[in-house]
Amino acid sequence: MSRVGKKPIPIPAKTKVTVSNGTVTVQGEKGKLERPLHPDVELKIEGDEITVVPVVERRKITAVQGLVRSLVANMVTGVSTGFKRVLEVNGIGYKAELNGQTLNLTLGFSHPVDFPLPQGITAEVDKKNNITLEGIDNELLGQTAASIRALRPPEPYKGKGIKYAEERIIRKAGKTGA
């Protein structure tokens, strides 16, 4: 049995979970999320808890059970409290600005980079060039943050680039003079 998959998922107040036709729908204060359900796993909603139950006990299915439990738990957390990711832009002349749903980045290239934000993701840029991304879909939020970071990943010598706020860059020593 999957240890993660066996844990029940608490349903907060003002959050509604429904399962129909192999699709799980979670609706809460911040919005609504839908996801297809794996055919080898069932969701049982009892009171204010959701449990993920495998249809057949097999090793691969218990792995899927843990995955589905994590995905549904992220959906419940997303529609009730939401997710947040902070990126830092480091470097001389590097800056970030927000124009509507487009993030304008100056990253040391010969041209500015315009990054359109996907629907469901909101961004804020403060004076210290910190980009705060928020959304209810954890998967979409993480992919958006990774795509922005990939535009100019941090380099190990001076630390210039875009990095996650909690990320620690291991610095290398540069060349020593003659």
Curated annotation (Swiss-Prot):
Alphabetical keyword list: Ribonucleoprotein, Ribosomal protein, RNA-binding, rRNA-binding
UniProt key word Membrane: no
GO terms of molecular function: rRNA binding; structural constituent of ribosome
Biological processes, Gene Ontology terms: cytoplasmic translation
Highest rank taxon of the organism: Bacteria
Pfam families named among the record's database cross-references: Ribosomal_L6 (PF00347)
Record flagged with keyword Ribonucleoprotein: yes
A GO cellular-component term linked to this record: cytosolic large ribosomal subunit
SUPFAM superfamilies: Ribosomal protein L6
Cross-referenced InterPro entries: Ribosomal_uL6-like, Ribosomal_uL6-like_a/b-dom_sf, Ribosomal_uL6_a/b-dom, Ribosomal_uL6_bac-type, Ribosomal_uL6_CS
Record note on quaternary structure: Part of the 50S ribosomal subunit.
HAMAP family documented for this protein: Ribosomal_uL6_B
Family indicated by similarity: Belongs to the universal ribosomal protein uL6 family.
Function summary: This protein binds to the 23S rRNA, and is important in its secondary structure. It is located near the subunit interface in the base of the L7/L12 stalk, and near the tRNA binding site of the peptidyltransferase center.
Protein name per its UniProtKB record: Large ribosomal subunit protein uL6
Species of origin: Desulfatibacillum aliphaticivorans
Lineage, broadest ranks: Bacteria, Pseudomonadati, Thermodesulfobacteriota, Desulfobacteria, Desulfobacterales
Gene of this entry: rplF
